[in-house]
């Protein structure tokens, strides 16, 4: 009795609860999942510094059952990693799962979906980004010509201002017409 391991202080849990869409219990569950990815690397009890500095390699995160079959798993890791390489600290991992939770609002989900599809990270989804998305989704099932036609059609239909690329507002307009966007942009912990 009395030998309970405390993962986070009360203040840390309050802070995490304030900046995510999770309850305290869910935050502790997220930490457990994070630790299971690399128990040799992630301490059972984390200090504030470790929560942002101990990073689990992207390759380990990509193997999670919830991401394993997702063709965008690497881009998801890169979009949430502070190092840009896809390696996630606990805080990065918590942010990612918070955005993919049912409680996250639509505008935050749209922002991160845009970030995932913006392969060149220029703040727009251009032709090259669409080609990368199509290649990621279809592998070699479509020809380069078919990829080209689809990318051209998306730009033609979604590019309201005619600049040849999609801004986040144009992307949001398109993505919100997809009836299953909110339900598919989701990871259950």
Swiss-Prot record:
Domain of life where this protein originates: Eukaryota
Pfam families: EF-hand_7
Gene3D superfamilies recorded: EF-hand
Cellular localization per UniProt: Cytoplasm
Gene disruption phenotype: RNAi-mediated knockdown results in reduced photoresponse and impaired responses to flicker stimuli at high frequencies. Failure to sustain an adequate photoresponse during prolonged stimulation. No obvious eye dysmorphology when raised under 12 hr:12 hr light-dark conditions. Significant photoreceptor degeneration when raised under constant light for 5 days.
UniProt keywords, alphabetically: Calcium, Cytoplasm, Magnesium, Metal-binding, Repeat
Function: Calcium- and integrin-binding protein. Plays a role in intracellular calcium homeostasis. Critical for proper photoreceptor cell maintenance and function. Required for prevention of light-dependent retinal degeneration.
Additional remarks: The binding of either calcium or magnesium significantly increases the structural stability of the protein in comparison to apo-CIB (calcium- and magnesium-free form).
Name of this chain's protein: Calcium and integrin-binding family member 2
Species of origin: Drosophila melanogaster
Gene name in the database record: Cib2
């Amino acid at each position: 009795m009395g030998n309970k391991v405390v993962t986070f202080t009360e203040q840390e849990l309050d802070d995490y609860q304030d900046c995510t869409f999770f309850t305290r219990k869910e935050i502790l569950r997220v930490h457990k999942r994070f630790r299971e990815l690399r128990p040799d690397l992630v301490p059972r009890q984390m200090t504030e510094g470790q929560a942002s500095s101990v990073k689990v390699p992207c390759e380990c995160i990509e193997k999670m059952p919830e991401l394993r079959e997702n063709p965008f798993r690497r881009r998801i890791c890169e979009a949430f990693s502070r190092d840009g390489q896809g390696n996630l600290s606990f805080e990065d991992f918590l942010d990612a799962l918070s955005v993919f939770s049912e409680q996250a609002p639509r505008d935050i989900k749209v922002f991160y979906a845009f970030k995932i599809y913006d392969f060149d990270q220029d703040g727009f989804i251009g032709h090259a980004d669409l080609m990368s998305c199509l290649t990621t989704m279809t592998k070699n099932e479509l020809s380069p010509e078919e990829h080209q036609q689809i990318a051209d059609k998306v730009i033609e239909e979604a590019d309201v201002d005619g600049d040849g690329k999609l801004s986040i507002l144009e992307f949001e307009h398109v993505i919100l017409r997809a009836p299953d966007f909110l339900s598919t942009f989701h990871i259950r912990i």
